[in-house]
Amino acid sequence: MGGAEDAPRAAAANGHGNGATVEEKLDELRRLLGKADGDPLRIVGVGAGAWGSVFCALMQDAYGHLRDKVQVRIWRRPGRAVDRATAEHLFEVINAREDVLRRLIRRCAYLKYVEGRLGDRTLYADEILRDGFCLNMIDTPLCPLKVVTNLQEAVWDADIVINGLPSTDTREVFGEIGRYWKERITAPIILSLAKGIEASLDPLPRIITPTQMISNATGVPLENILYLGGPNIASEIYNKEYANARICGADKWRKPLAKFLRQPHFIVWDNSDLITHEVMGGLKNVYAIGAGMVAALTNESATSKSVYFALCTSEMIYITHLLEEEPEKLAGPLLADTYVTLLKGRNAWYGQKLAKGELTLEMGDSIKGKGTIQGVSAVNAFYELLSQDSLSVMHPEANRSVAPVEMCPILKALYKILIKRELPPDSILQAIRDETMYDPRERIEMAQGHSLYRPSLLGQPKGDAKA
């Protein structure tokens, strides 16, 4: 059911034939985790969206041939049927790739895809994932994966858990996981890929990030929970496009994990600023929807997209200064992550489709073949949070106190378009063409030159904001 028999071939095909170096990295992490001989390191993905599936496939490709020392498995919910049109497209993908075709024939798995193509059989998302096909990314075949549909079975003995869930599902699923971990003596390491936030307004306005949701739901200390983000498009990463990422969190685990995750085509650096990276991970999805709208409405005008980029990044910088005294600068991988998401991510795609009329808001934010559009819920969360009068800031021109959201006109426009549905998508252009708007540099200078920091937004006293 896993992909163990294919692992040596996958390792060689993906440039990891040098077993000594790979095995040394694995042995080093096993020692740090206190793993005894004969007790494999258990890496478990929770959630099988595009990035979560690719991440587990990268681990399987790199380390799966060392099956006595490591096990990689992934959990996804059972029962999700593959529709006929997707089954037909999947069959085309299989037949276009000789290596995939031969693999399925060798595993006696090809016939079911013929039957699915003909409509004689219903395929399910968990069974095709076992063969290396992620429902949200059919065009990019992965290596075979060991798929578990029982959550308790998947996670109860995990050493490292990869959170590949949307932020909107993280609290619920990890709440269930927390019940299975009540008897655990040692806490696992959790690496979150989720990008999004929740807003809590009672008793005070505050932001809740996915790592905080996980800690609250499971009781796992924050020093064992990390975030990984970067300028990464899942399909391109698996196709060996050169990429980099940052793993963020406490000192204890981020450096060893950065070394363990690093591959020739996927460079992982470490950084202590968990909060800024998680918040930016949510913010970039917010503004990516607007970027897609602008691209579609202006016929891909480079000038208009650049204007939007300057304005939205200034709002992002402004918002992060409310959350931290000295946030990580929007530069390097943080800036690149924002850039690639505005350029090509699923949230930008969603904005384009809305602006072209090919999707409607009534269709919801879970789109077939794409998964959850996390920017929609993030727009609502950030707007609700920043519209609270108790967080008021001084308006530089009106010389009066206003809610922070008044300093973020693009966020306001996206809220009225996506959440309130008061304005059509083309109103995003008015938000970037307002003649009374000041230079985005002024917003950045306001953020950096004034005491915007509100420690209560993170639900903790001043000085304790950083992980």
Swiss-Prot record:
Keywords: Cytoplasm, NAD, Oxidoreductase. May be involved in cell redox homeostasis. The keyword Cell membrane does not apply. Its main location: cytoplasm. One of its GO terms (cellular component) is cytosol. This is Probable glycerol-3-phosphate dehydrogenase [NAD(+)] 2, cytosolic. It is found in: Cytoplasm, Cytosol. GO terms for biological process: carbohydrate metabolic process; glycerol-3-phosphate catabolic process; glycerol-3-phosphate metabolic process. Pfam families: NAD_Gly3P_dh_C, NAD_Gly3P_dh_N. Belongs to the NAD-dependent glycerol-3-phosphate dehydrogenase family. InterPro entries: 6-PGluconate_DH-like_C_sf, 6PGD_dom2, G3P_DH_NAD-dep, G3P_DH_NAD-dep_C, G3P_DH_NAD-dep_N, NAD(P)-bd_dom_sf. Signal peptide: none annotated. The keyword Oxidoreductase applies. The active site is at residue 284.
